[in-house]
Amino acid sequence: MISLNSIFLLSLVGLSRAAPSRSETSPDRTIKPRAACTPTAGGSSSTDDVPAIQEAITSCGDGGIIIIPADTTYYLNSVLDFKGCSNCDFQVEGLLQFTSSTDYWNGKTAMITVSDIDGLKLRSVTGSGVIDGNGQESWDKFAEDSSYKRPTLLYITGGSNIEVSGLRQKNPPNVFISVKGDTSNAQFTSLTMDATSNSDNLPKNTDAFDIGASTYVTISSVAITNDDDCVAFKPGANYVTVENVSCTGSHGISVGSLGKSSDDTVQNVYARNITMINSSKAAGIKTYPSGGDHGLSTVKNATFEDFIVDGCDYAFQIQSCYGEDDTYCEENPGDAVLEGIVVKGFTGTTSDKEDPVVANLNCGSKGTCDVTISGFEVKAPSGDAKILCGNTPSDLGVTCSSGASG
């Protein structure tokens, strides 16, 4: 008779014979370290460091690391193109300073281009990295000549898995960051963005983020000072989240403008935990009216939640006559489709510019106005809180007064 212990031992022997050895299952391989490149800085604004940086991207861009070291200035006198980067890690710990030449930048689309790149980290690990667009001369020239074409600081089109973090970006000639071209999975976090003029000419059109045709874009933990939209959801924006952002001097968190010359759609956008300081509005929607060459504007599933309003002219605004005057819109009413628009948890105090009005909601008479408002506790400096409404639903959620415009 075979004992139970014997059966157990025989079973172990069988298992030991059947199981492959460690050497049979573990491949013989060596993990190679990531390539790392540090471009050589020319040390003078008369030397363009872009070729050296692009050579580093060519050498180390395929899965490697490119380092802009601390306490070092790189002078960029031409467009920096990230072509050649694939899953690369571009670490800015020093200063990238672009030339202020208005002659060179006139008509250029961007200062930094990221086109059809799959995998890019553009970041500062230590938080000391700065990208300086050196835009003062461009702002001054634009004040004299509005036909002057200024570049975007960082232009992302196409591609996926883009991360921009830890940096300070300052003084772009035009927009800070533009995302379009069906870009997917882009994250922007822990950024400081400021456009501050040292002349009487304002830093016009310095949107912090223009988010166009793209999916799954996240903007979080960003402090912005500028003179245009804080974040603009442009045509084609889909699944965009904005949270824990503060904006000073801006035109707000804005959908649009939409419908200027084509049918435009923005959908599935969510903005929460936003602090808006001294801005023309905290949040809003801008759509062109019907008629002429204008297209149909559609905004679906947009939520604005937990906004602190500090000295903004309006807490929330809906414009259905954007870009046209009242006479035009009387003949060609707004026809925008607004569906699933949620505004909730707004607190704070507006500026005295529109006192006692704190919100101006002018939906188009030919359109759809599916808007709900709750927890809206914004006051004007006088202590009143008047909300102007036009063509809004009866279950809007707030008490309306007539006289909406825009």
Swiss-Prot record:
Signal peptide per UniProt: 1-18
Enzyme nomenclature, EC number: 3.2.1.-
Pfam families: Glyco_hydro_28 (PF00295)
Glycosylation positions in this chain: 244, 273, 278, 301
Disordered: region residues: 20-49
Record's keyword terms, sorted: Carbohydrate metabolism, Cell wall biogenesis/degradation, Glycoprotein, Glycosidase, Hydrolase, Polysaccharide degradation, Repeat, Secreted, Signal
Subcellular location, principal: secreted
Residue stretches spanning the membrane: none
GO biological process entries: cell wall organization; polysaccharide catabolic process
Stretches forming PbH1 repeats: 183-213, 214-235, 237-257, 266-289, 299-320, 368-390
Gene Ontology CC annotation, any one: extracellular region
Entry superkingdom: Eukaryota
Gene Ontology terms for molecular function: polygalacturonase activity
Active site per database record: 228 (proton donor), 251
UniProt key word Secreted: yes
Gene3D superfamilies: Single-stranded right-handed beta-helix, Pectin lyase-like (2.160.20.10)
Subcellular location: Secreted
Family to which this protein belongs: Belongs to the glycosyl hydrolase 28 family.
Chain's role: Pectinolytic enzyme involved in the degradation of xylogalacturonan (xga), a galacturonan backbone heavily substituted with xylose, and which is one important component of the hairy regions of pectin. Activity requires a galacturonic acid backbone substituted with xylose.
PANTHER family for the chain: ENDO-XYLOGALACTURONAN HYDROLASE A-RELATED (PTHR31736:SF9), PTHR31736
Protein name listed in UniProt: Probable endo-xylogalacturonan hydrolase A
Organism: Aspergillus oryzae (strain ATCC 42149 / RIB 40)
